[in-house]
């Protein structure tokens, strides 16, 4: 156990690092494993519902899944103006996966870290204080940035597919500032290219930091509440948990919607 509040907070904000000496190339095992489990959980539940779907007597889980699918499909139809069969499944995956990652923040702060400490000490003889386990993948900037980089790759890929490699390259040099004069176009090309690079870089950065910042702040507040006397934990923790349900849902929805918007803009000509 932590000897004081500072150690307690530091311990709960430290990731399970695969190899601290590896620096940039080290892996946050807890983030990776929890994300993988949640991804499999989402896929398994939706696959099970699809196999057991019934028109005559749909169950509650089927109705709930259909409601989510309809919500996502409606947003895609309203926002994405191109033609692609993968946008709706992609948006559904993003929304559900990010929501499940965010939802991990609602579990008791000490539940998983203490379980990891017990397993580490009992089966591997590890010192409990040196066993770390964070269960909110979206509170890890590495995870949110990895997802946003994947979105950036999709943006570039969709843009090239819609406009061709030459058309995409031309757009990098001729938008947002145009000139019918060849000399003016040459002068504006470096400026346009710089603007396009800034725009491309801003999208993944804003996506990742928005999600990370909200979930990191939420996790930190839960940790601070856990330091209070037991009675106050319930008085403050319950209202914050209820409010946090709105936050985790909203952040998953925002991440999904911005991805759809960015992909829609990518296939439209300037």
From Swiss-Prot:
One Pfam family name is: ATP-synt_A
Q: Write down the membrane topology.
A: Multi-pass membrane protein
Is Iron found in the keyword set? no
GO cellular component term of the entry, any: proton-transporting ATP synthase complex
Listed GO MF terms? proton-transporting ATP synthase activity, rotational mechanism
- Chief subcellular site? membrane
* Spans traversing the lipid bilayer: 29-49, 87-107, 108-128, 140-160, 182-202, 220-240, 241-261
Give the quaternary structure.
F-type ATPases have 2 components, CF(1) - the catalytic core - and CF(0) - the membrane proton channel. CF(1) has five subunits: alpha(3), beta(3), gamma(1), delta(1), epsilon(1). CF(0) has three main subunits: a(1), b(2) and c(9-12). The alpha and beta chains form an alternating ring which encloses part of the gamma chain. CF(1) is attached to CF(0) by a central stalk formed by the gamma and epsilon chains, while a peripheral stalk is formed by the delta and b chains.
The family this protein is said to belong to: Belongs to the ATPase A chain family.
State what this protein does. Key component of the proton channel; it plays a direct role in the translocation of protons across the membrane.
Q: Which NCBIfam families match?
A: ATP_synt_6_or_A, PRK05815.1-1
Q: What is this protein called?
A: ATP synthase subunit a
Source organism per entry reads: Chromobacterium violaceum (strain ATCC 12472 / DSM 30191 / JCM 1249 / CCUG 213 / NBRC 12614 / NCIMB 9131 / NCTC 9757 / MK)
Q: Identify the taxonomic lineage of the organism of origin.
A: Bacteria, Pseudomonadati, Pseudomonadota, Betaproteobacteria, Neisseriales
